[in-house]
């Protein structure tokens, strides 16, 4: 397979992840209540048994819940922007002769992909899924969606 085809595929895929991150962040701002409700229920652990072994982990302060949601949105926007800028850098600066030029242009792309991966793996699967026991939260369990996002980013 020609190296230009592989490079073009990398640019397109990183750009797609970037658009996804920015679009997700913007959607969470425009339709704030929908996903804030998920964050609220996961952090407050109100869908779990009230006297469960992990009930002490619950965060019920609405200010802290809003702060957590703002951090999620900011991370989505940041990884998205980094990936878009990274894709543009790969498309432009990465077109020089040889592998070194393309490799030298990967920094923003790698940073954006790593941040997106960390959001869904650490933020949703580890913190949300395990610490706050989201896997037990019925309709508020967003682990499947997070895993899909994690898998897509991980493949890129």
Regions found by a protein language model. Name each.
Residues 6-38:
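N-terminal signal-anchor transmembrane alpha helix
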Residues 10-16, 72, 109-119:
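Hydrophobic alpha-helical transmembrane segments of polytopic
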Residues 1-5:
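Short, Lys/Arg-rich, polar N-terminal cytosolic tail immediately upstream
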Residues 58-79:
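Individual transmembrane alpha-helix segments
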Residues 33-64:
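Membrane-interface interhelical connector segments
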Residues 114-156:
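Alpha-helical transmembrane segments of multi-pass integral membrane proteins
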Residues 81-110:
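Cytoplasmic juxtamembrane regions at transmembrane-helix boundaries
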């Amino acid at each position: 397979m020609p190296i230009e085809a592989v490079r073009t595929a990398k640019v397109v895929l990183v750009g797609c992840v970037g658009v996804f991150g920015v679009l997700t962040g913007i959607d969470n701002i425009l339709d704030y209540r929908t996903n804030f409700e998920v964050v609220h229920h996961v952090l407050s652990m109100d869908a779990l048994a009230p006297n469960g072994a992990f009930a002490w982990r619950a965060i019920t302060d609405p200010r802290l819940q809003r702060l957590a949601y703002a951090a999620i949105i900011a991370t989505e926007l940041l990884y998205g922007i980094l990936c878009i800028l990274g894709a543009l850098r790969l498309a432009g600066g990465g077109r020089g002769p040889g592998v070194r030029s393309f490799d030298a242009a990967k920094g923003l792309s790698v940073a954006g992909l790593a941040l997106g991966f960390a959001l869904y793996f650490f933020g949703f699967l580890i913190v949300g899924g395990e610490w706050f026991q989201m896997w037990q939260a019925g309709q508020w369990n967003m682990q499947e969606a997070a895993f899909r996002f994690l898998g897509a980013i991980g493949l890129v």
